[in-house]
């Protein structure tokens, strides 16, 4: 595939340039020898990690977008970080976070009523509460923990629709994500269509802003991360690639063209957390996704950041 060839060429160029520096040429004119060696070692490690992602793309016949931020060291891992992918249901954690930001804790307890006509495909929680309605807090939890699509739509409505959701992301510095549609149309993932797409870097940065920075108050951050820790749809994704004893809170997503995504906060024992976004797709509309791709990519990321 042309896509894979480009990635392989890029890796070859990367190694080639590093070889020049190893054999005597160095662009670090103003650095000490030790500084240059440190940068050289870091770049070589990055190339080796990228090669592993290239190999995963070949193994699973897929395209990957990866971005991770180690909060303690500020080290990042990036692979196709600025390429667009359909965000699919990963938006639900960001929409819930935006709803948390917009409303007081008391307001979250207000009951929202909806009708049978509002229900869309895959709404395992909201479909059980047509008669009683659900609180905004319960709706947010259903969207994150169970990826309930009607709950996702209600969150979007609370923000003023997809346009309002996009605006809420712009307020935290995200001018990349393009939100245009409701569930379930937003999962079409048509190649070249930028509607309802984002990048691994943008989604990871958004998640960091809502869960670890000061965008939300401490009590609201705790509510959000508790929902993520209880996600029922992510056991085979980033969580499966994490070392034993590392806690993961995530939000998964899936769509057409073999789209499979997961964005997460990972808490290693006794150290600062890691933010990870792994996005993927394949090349035909009815292609199936493989959860193992996300798990193996996560393993590469987290092993590199150990």
UniProtKB/Swiss-Prot annotation:
Record localization: Secreted
Catalytic activity field: a beta-lactam + H2O = a substituted beta-amino acid
Catalytic-site annotation from UniProt: 89 (acyl-ester intermediate)
PROSITE patterns hit by this protein: BETA_LACTAMASE_A
First and last residue of the signal peptide: 1-36
Keywords noted in UniProt: Antibiotic resistance, Hydrolase, Secreted, Signal
GO CC, any one term: extracellular region
Record GO biological process: beta-lactam antibiotic catabolic process; response to antibiotic
InterPro entries: Beta-lactam/transpept-like, Beta-lactam_cat, Beta-lactam_class-A, Beta-lactam_class-A_AS
Pfam families: Beta-lactamase2 (PF13354)
Class of enzymatic activity (EC top level): hydrolase
Residues noted as binding substrate in the record, renumbered to the chain: 251-253
Coiled-coil parts of chain: none
EC number: 3.5.2.6
One function term, GO molecular function aspect: beta-lactamase activity
Role description: This protein is a beta-lactamase with a substrate specificity for penicillins.
Family membership noted in the UniProt record: Belongs to the class-A beta-lactamase family.
Misc. remarks from the entry: The class A beta-lactamase family has a specific amino-acid numbering system, sometimes called Ambler or ABL numbering and often misspelt as Amber. A multiple sequence alignment was used to derive a consensus sequence and then the consensus was numbered taking into account insertions and deletions. This allows use of identical numbers, e.g. for active site residues, despite differences in protein length. UniProt always uses natural numbering of residues, hence there appear to be differences in numbering between this entry and some papers.
The protein's name in its UniProt record: Beta-lactamase
Originating species: Bacillus subtilis (strain 168)
């Amino acid at each position: 595939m042309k896509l894979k060839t480009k990635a392989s060429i890029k890796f070859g160029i990367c190694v080639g340039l590093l070889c020049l520096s190893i054999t005597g040429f160095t662009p670090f004119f103003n650095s000490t020898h030790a500084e240059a060696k440190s940068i050289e070692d870091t770049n070589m490690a990055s190339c080796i990690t990228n090669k592993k992602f290239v190999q995963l793309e070949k193994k699973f016949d897929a395209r990957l977008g990866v971005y991770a931020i180690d909060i303690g060291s500020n080290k990042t891992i990036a692979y196709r970080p600025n390429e667009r992918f359909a965000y699919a249901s990963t938006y639900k954690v960001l929409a819930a976070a935006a709803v948390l930001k917009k409303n007081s804790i008391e307001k979250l307890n207000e009951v929202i009523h909806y009708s049978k006509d509002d229900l869309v495909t895959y709404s395992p929680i909201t479909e059980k509460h047509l008669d009683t309605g659900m609180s905004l807090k319960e709706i947010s939890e259903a969207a994150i923990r169970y990826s309930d699509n009607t709950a996702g739509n209600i969150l979007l409505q609370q923000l003023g629709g997809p346009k309002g959701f996009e605006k809420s992301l712009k307020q935290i510095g995200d001018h990349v994500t393009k939100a245009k549609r409701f569930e379930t149309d937003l999962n079409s993932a048509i190649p070249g269509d930028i509607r309802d797409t984002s990048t691994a870097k943008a989604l990871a940065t958004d998640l960091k802003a809502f869960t670890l920075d000061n965008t939300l108050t401490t009590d609201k951050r705790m509510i959000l991360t508790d929902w993520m820790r209880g996600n029922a749809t992510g056991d085979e994704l980033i969580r499966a690639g994490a070392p034993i004893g590392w806690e993961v809170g995530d939000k998964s997503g899936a769509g057409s063209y073999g789209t499979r995504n997961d964005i997460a906060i990972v808490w290693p024992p006794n150290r600062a957390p890691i933010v990870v976004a792994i996005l993927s797709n394949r090349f035909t509309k009815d292609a199936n996704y493989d959860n193992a791709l996300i798990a193996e990519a996560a393993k590469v990321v987290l092993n590199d950041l150990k």
